[in-house]
């Protein structure tokens, strides 16, 4: 019977296993970092998209208020510059400065006004004694400023600035501008 001597250099050494594990660990750490970056960029994009939608919806609301005659052209103004002549109700105007963005339009039914955070209370009727200011209706991290400028007797510039969280812990601003004429008919008629 013949005995064969095993080659001592066959197989994997402990050193090779440790090196392979080290390379794999570095690769997995890099993958984890890239996933974190992807989530941050995704949040940033989502917040920017939401901000654009908020700004555009407010600009479109101004045209709808005029077209449906819920407000007259003179009433679409900041507080202190409202002309209630010929209106069916007195409107106080859109507040100046940055204010919370609410999920509720408040008792006047118009987003962007000073009453947006008013909760009707337990009776669910506005204007009763149980109404209260409900800050939970504000969209966390978001605020807006509405500036309405009269360019002529028949033309207004509406500028909406929205402050929003960018997903990286910073607050950014998005500015949207539109022009509103004193003609409730659609431009294509």
What function would you assign to each model-found segment?
Residues 1-12:
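N-terminal leader/signal peptides at the extreme start of proteins
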Residues 4, 20-23, 171:
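Exposed boundary/loop context
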Residues 49, 53-189:
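Low-complexity, Gly/Pro-rich coil/beta segments used as flexible assembly/activation regions
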């Amino acid at each position: 019977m013949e005995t064969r001597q095993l080659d001592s250099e066959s197989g994997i050494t402990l050193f090779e296993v440790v090196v392979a594990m080290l390379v794999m660990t570095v690769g997995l750490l890099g993958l984890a970092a890239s996933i974190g970056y992807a989530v941050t960029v995704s949040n940033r994009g989502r917040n920017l998209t939401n901000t654009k939608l908020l700004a555009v919806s407010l600009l479109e609301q101004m045209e709808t208020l005029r077209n449906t005659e819920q407000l007259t052209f003179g009433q679409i103004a900041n507080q202190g510059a409202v002309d209630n002549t010929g209106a069916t109700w007195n409107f106080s105007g859109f507040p100046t400065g940055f204010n919370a963005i609410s999920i509720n339009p408040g008792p006047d039914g118009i987003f962007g006004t000073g009453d947006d955070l008013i909760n009707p209370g337990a009776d669910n009727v506005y204007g009763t004694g149980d109404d209260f200011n409900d800050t939970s209706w504000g969209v966390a991290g978001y605020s807006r400023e509405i500036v309405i400028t009269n360019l002529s007797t028949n033309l207004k510039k509406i500028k909406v600035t929205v402050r929003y969280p960018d997903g990286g812990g910073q607050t950014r601003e998005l500015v949207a501008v539109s022009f509103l004429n004193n003609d409730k008919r659609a431009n294509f008629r």
